[in-house]
Amino acid sequence: MSKRFVVVVEDEPFLRSLITNALETAGFEVASVGSAAEARKLFNKRDPDAAILDIDLGPGPTGLDMGERLLALSPGTAVVYLTMLSDPRVINPTSGLVNPRAAYLNKRKLSDTQELIDALEAVLHDQDISEYRHDLDPNSPIAKLSAGQLQVLQLVSKGMTNQQIADKRKRSLSATEALISRTFTSLGIDLGRDSNTRILAVKEFIRQAGIVVRDDQD
């Protein structure tokens, strides 16, 4: 019986090596790469049985983009997202939900690599994967936020003023201030009138939520 072929896409070298070793020990054939460009070359050469994808890979396609493309071209491919992001919308606030056939694991919630392998086996065998969908956790601090609220939270974390946020989103200042206020209320953040406290509080929340804030590339 041939080994099942798994592609691992993870930009952190140590974690990529750890995952690769665990999968090989579990009997999988593994090819691991650190970027979307390298992954694309692998997928063009050979169809994998499964893919374990980090989501935030820097500029260019995300792991979500790759996973959706894989599932569109080969619905039988098992896809497991492995990420620090508690909510996939932080990469693209307007994106939809993760494909129901894919597992979504938060790196912060995994105690060992066996949980990752268990999730992979569950997807491969078309079993119930509800326990491997960390993005659907109702207790997630940002699960209640709308796409617009997620976007303003990211912009506030970058130190942008309310006026700058309004300009970037092409909204009025009053509408922007109201949205920011509703966002903070939803999160239970009491910021008072100190703008420095405001920024620090939001940045701390974003750090805890696993959100990666990047400067614009354009």
Mark where each language-model region is.
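Two-component/phosphorelay signaling modules centered on CheY-like receiver
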Residues: E12-A31
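Acidic, metal-coordinating helix/loop segments flanking the phosphotransfer/catalytic sites
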Residues: T20, S32-A50
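Alpha4 helix (beta4-alpha4-beta5 surface) of REC/receiver domains from two-component response regulators
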Residues: D65, L85-N106, S111-Q114
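Regulatory hinge/linker segments at domain boundaries
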Residues: I129-L155
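Recognition helix of helix-turn-helix DNA-binding domains
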Residues: T161-T197
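Basic, Lys/Arg-enriched C-terminal extension of HTH/homeodomain DNA-binding domains
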Residues: R182-D218
